[in-house]
Regions:
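Short, structured segments at the rim of ligand-binding sites
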Residues: 1-425
């Protein structure tokens, strides 16, 4: 094989979703857990710090982090402040865990995090016996006066995010009796599958009834070591880069046995004409030699919405429009991601149409523009991929990638030294 046909080997850090779930499950377990190859980024460090605010002992180890779990919810004698920074997972996963303990906990975060909705979680915790209050907009700051959670039956609006359900499920083994949740209009279902798999790894008993109803039995968790696989959402950027540059890129360790639904993005790339190979050892995407993309299709990315911007950013390079739908909940992430994508594509001279849960991107030549990142790491990374093919792209906040992949820009330059990466990096 020559240089152009030998796949490039991408260095993708550990999954944020797995890292933060495993941190919490280890903290709730009885005993010591070694978490190997965790993602080390702003979001996971914020989650780790929030757990230490709750009294959990976490120390650095050669291969990752050691967590000493207490086998129960946290107990404090005085009001305890918990800093979530920008980490939405901390704001949504940790209050249910705290509610299974004893004491008063006050959760707060950045202005960006204060703008993200928490009302469904607050209402659910109240229904389970917790005393909870939040800001006037149904968001942070959130106060939990904890005295354990009862469990029982619960209907949960899951149309904004699957993270409310995830937080409640992970706390359920610490409740006084079984929890049965009926998730209404559940989005991002693969993240719930991931959560249940990790809960079972740590010894929980959970039954998925297959109709949006899940029952979790009390009984706690037991410590269990875990190695974190590469982040599939992050991998979407280098796999898309392979498609638009005509190269092959392999992500080792992210294969057919992955816990992450976002690996499904590779199959979306297959619809654009890229060659995709998924084995147990890893995933390889190879673009057409000229980097051309086939459009003219619509795709539901509701279950893998963290990757929709990756497709949207490269869609102008296709030969026909591409419509992405089922992503209405992406309007409530770090930014209104549908609107942010549309505005940035318009700045580049690309025509789009959007609806409440969809966006259509038309092909076209892009002009120079500064991308508005809105402090959203995924906007910066997605449009950086387009920048490999489209000259004159700059980012107004290139450092925001530190939320999940601090080394992103360096890795993109390493993989594609013959292509221009966006200026300002």
């Amino acid at each position: 094989m020559n240089r152009l046909t030998t796949p490039l080997i991408a260095r993708i850090p550990g999954s944020k979703s797995i890292t933060n779930r495993a941190l919490l499950l280890a903290a709730a377990s009885a005993g010591d857990t070694r978490l190997s190859a965790p993602l080390i980024s702003e979001d996971t460090l914020a989650f780790r710090t929030a757990l230490t605010d709750l009294g959990i002992r976490i120390t650095d180890a050669d291969t990752g982090w050691d967590i000493r779990g207490g086998g129960r919810g946290p107990t404090v004698g005085a009001t305890t402040s918990v800093a979530c920074a920008d980490a939405g997972t901390a704001a949504r996963f940790l209050p249910p865990f705290a509610a299974t303990g004893r004491g008063e906990f006050v959760f707060d975060g950045s202005d960006q995090l204060r703008a993200r909705p928490l009302r469904p979680l607050v209402d659910a915790l109240g229904a389970l016996g917790a005393r909870v209050s939040c800001g006037p907009a149904g968001a942070l700051p959130l106060t939990v006066a904890a005295d354990g959670l009862d469990g029982g039956d619960l209907d949960l609006d899951s149309s904004f995010s699957s993270q409310y359900l995830t937080g409640l499920l992970m706390a359920a083994p610490l409740m006084r009796r079984a929890l049965t949740v009926r998730a209404k209009a559940l989005v991002s279902r693969p993240y719930i599958d991931m959560t249940l798999a990790l809960m079972r790894h740590f010894g929980a008993t959970a039954e998925d009834h297959g109709d949006g109803t899940i029952t979790v039995r009390p009984g706690g968790y037991r410590a269990a070591d875990l190695t974190v696989e590469p982040d599939a959402s992050t991998a979407s950027y280098v796999l898309a880069a392979a498609a638009v540059t005509g190269r092959g890129v392999t992500v080792p360790g992210l294969g057919g046995t992955s816990l992450q639904g976002d690996l499904g993005f590779a199959h979306v790339l297959r619809r654009t004409g890229a060659h995709v190979a998924v084995t147990d050892a890893g995933t390889t995407v190879t673009g057409r030699p000229d980097g051309s993309l086939t459009g003219g299709f619509a795709v539901d990315m509701g279950d893998i919405s963290d990757t929709f911007m990756t497709l949207a950013a490269i869609a102008p390079l296709a030969d026909a429009p591409i419509t992405i739908h089922g992503i209405g909940h992406a309007r409530f992430k770090e930014s209104d991601r549908i609107e942010a994508v549309a505005r940035n594509l318009a700045a580049l001279g690309i025509r789009t149409e959007q609806g409440p849960d969809r966006i259509t991107i038309h092909p076209g030549a892009t002009g120079p523009a500064e991308i508005a990142c809105y402090r959203d790491h995924r906007i910066a990374m997605a449009f950086s991929v387009l920048g490999l093919r489209a000259g004159g792209i700059t980012l107004d906040d290139p450092s925001c990638v530190g939320k999940t992949f601090p080394g992103f820009h360096a890795e993109l330059r390493r993989l594609f030294p013959d292509h221009t990466t966006p200026q300002g990096i």
